[in-house]
Amino acid sequence: STLSPSSAASDVYKRQEFWNGIKEEKVGIGVITKFDTEDYKVKIAAEVKDFNVKERLDNKAARRMEVFSQYAVAASREAFAMAGLDMEKEDPYRVGCYVGSGIGSLQAMEREHKRLLERGASRINPLLVPLMISNMACGNVSIQLGLKGKSLNVVTACATGTHSIGEAFRSIQIGDADVIVAGGTEAAICPMGVGGLSLIHI
């Protein structure tokens, strides 16, 4: 399942709209709306729009996840449902999770760096590190879906999602798992992400 600029909503209509967009060669890239780009050379991106976390996660779980993890959990739940998987019928120790993120949460780093400068080190969110590190997408998917098999966080920049799927294929092929939730997640459309990537022309 894919969360994309045109498929963030959870209903069947949006998934069909996304697929129709692919067939019709529609572009999901537009002007950045998440922050002011006046001082940036790059002003466009493929933002995920209409993502309502309250429709996807309970409030307690959502508060302990950054956006990249929320995307991963939402897409994984949708993929599970579309595949007709039922954890009550699966051995949880044979169901793994290979969901990677190339960069984790730059938003958390931006937010807490600002707090550090304004209020001092003692005021940094104690959950900063577990919120921002890239393996938390995989960890949160496993927790939310009850997966207890192999867990792997692949970090290979823009190849992360494809690499994760390849590693999952190999693990199933050699008998390490029966089912693996695999893919990649990213939420780097923020001042630091766009600024840094634009300077190296990515």
Regions found by a protein language model. Give the residues of each.
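Short conserved active-site loop signatures built around small residues
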Residues: 161
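Local beta-strand N-terminus motif with an aromatic residue
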Residues: 9, 94-95, 177
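Small-residue (primarily alanine) positions within well-ordered alpha-helices
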Residues: 8-9, 79, 164, 168
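Single conserved hydrophobic/aromatic residue that forms the stacking wall/gate
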Residues: 1-9, 13, 200-201
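Alpha-helix C-terminal capping segments
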Residues: 142-146, 167-176
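Acyl-CoA/ACP chain-elongation machinery
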Residues: 176-199
